[in-house]
């Protein structure tokens, strides 16, 4: 890679999917290659035809070291959205990658960020029964009361993460959300008294 770059190769050259070398290196966890490309001027926020960035790809592949490097790189948009309005946090939440969710939140990803339809990462995790992600999001202060404006996730027409979990028969996720709601109620948080 270094030799190609030394000979003048375009650091942000795209393939037929619109992916760059940085996206591919991130997806496969080649952190040293990612660092080299970034040091040579690769655009950390460049997206492919689906709007995914290197951070999306690394998060989807559960490549923690690559996500850490990308997430700390100067100028990175940790909340960049793809064509579906999904951030890397939405992607990790859907996949049930609890440790990745925690890392992305630590790197500054907005736990309340919404994709199309008003869905947060909590909605995505609840609807899919991604309980590891759900737990990490709840620990990170995700808003359990937020109601999506429209819901095309599975069988529900709209609602809170709890309503989506119940509609999609995600019993453990629903139990976790009911318990979180009860704890918030006991603290007075459901009435805005926090």
Please give the residue ranges for each predicted region.
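Ankyrin repeat domain, specifically the short helix-to-loop turn at the C-terminus of the second helix
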Residues: 2-9, 35-42, 68-76, 102-110, ...
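Ankyrin repeat boundary/linker residues
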Residues: 15, 48, 82, 115, ...
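Ankyrin repeat A-helix N-terminal signature
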Residues: 24-30, 57-63, 91-97, 124-130, ...
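Conserved ankyrin/ankyrin-like repeat signature
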Residues: 32-33, 65-66, 99-100, 133, ...
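Eukaryotic tandem repeat interaction scaffolds
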Residues: 60, 73-116
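Ankyrin-repeat-protein effector appendages
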Residues: 107, 140, 149-150, 155-194
């Amino acid at each position: 890679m270094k030799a190609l770059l030394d000979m003048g190769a375009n650091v942000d050259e795209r393939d037929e999917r619109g992916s760059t070398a940085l996206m591919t290196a991130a997806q496969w966890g080649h952190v040293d290659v990612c660092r080299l490309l970034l040091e040579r001027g690769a655009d950390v926020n460049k997206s492919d035809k689906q709007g995914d960035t290197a951070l999306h790809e690394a998060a989807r592949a559960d490549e923690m070291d690559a996500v850490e490097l990308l997430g700390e790189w100067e100028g990175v948009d940790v909340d960049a959205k793809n064509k579906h309005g999904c951030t890397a946090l939405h992607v990790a939440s859907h996949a049930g990658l609890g440790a990745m969710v925690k890392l992305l939140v630590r790197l500054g990803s907005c736990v309340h960020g919404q994709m199309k339809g008003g869905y947060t990462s909590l909605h995505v995790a609840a609807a899919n029964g991604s309980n590891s992600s759900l737990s990490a999001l709840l620990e990170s202060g995700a808003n359990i009361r937020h109601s999506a404006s429209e819901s095309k996730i599975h069988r529900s027409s709209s609602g809170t993460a709890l309503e989506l979990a119940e509609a999609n028969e995600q019993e453990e996720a629903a139990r976790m959300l009911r318990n979180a709601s009860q704890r918030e109620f006991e603290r007075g948080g459901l009435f805005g008294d926090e």
